[in-house]
Amino acid sequence: GRDAYIAQPENCVYECAKSSYCNDLCTKNGAKSGYCQWLGRWGNACYCIDLPDKVPIRIEGKCHFA
């Protein structure tokens, strides 16, 4: 696994206000834990600890929300 911003299918981060929301999201996806990183590179976004390799993460490039 890796520590990273978990991504939605369009390479967009999950915006957040509370770490509890991110912890639930991350652990549901197989991570050890997660928290809301405030004022990070992509604003307030969920960051996961030890997220499985099969789960998409935010990478360089634009976020493509339809």
UniProtKB/Swiss-Prot annotation:
Cellular component GO terms held in the UniProt record: extracellular region
PROSITE patterns: LCN_CSAB
Domain LCN-type CS-alpha/beta: 2-64
Entry-linked InterPro entries: LCN-type_CS_alpha_beta_dom, Scorpion_toxin-like, Scorpion_toxin-like_sf, Scorpion_toxinL, Scorpion_toxinL/defensin
GO molecular function terms attached to this record: sodium channel inhibitor activity; toxin activity
UniProt xrefs under Pfam families: Toxin_3 (PF00537)
Primary location group: secreted
Disulfide bond as UniProt keyword: yes
Expression tissues: Expressed by the venom gland.
Subcellular localization: Secreted
Listed CDD domains: neurotoxins_LC_scorpion
Keywords associated with the record: Disulfide bond, Ion channel impairing toxin, Neurotoxin, Secreted, Toxin, Voltage-gated sodium channel impairing toxin
Annotated S-S bridges: 12-63, 16-36, 22-46, 26-48
Gene Ontology biological process terms in this record: defense response
Family as reported in the entry's similarity comment: Belongs to the long (4 C-C) scorpion toxin superfamily. Sodium channel inhibitor family. Alpha subfamily.
Domain topic, free-text comment: Has the structural arrangement of an alpha-helix connected to antiparallel beta-sheets by disulfide bonds (CS-alpha/beta).
Role this protein plays: Alpha toxins bind voltage-independently at site-3 of sodium channels (Nav) and inhibit the inactivation of the activated channels, thereby blocking neuronal transmission.
Name this protein carries in UniProt: Toxin BomPI
Native organism: Buthus occitanus mardochei (Moroccan scorpion)
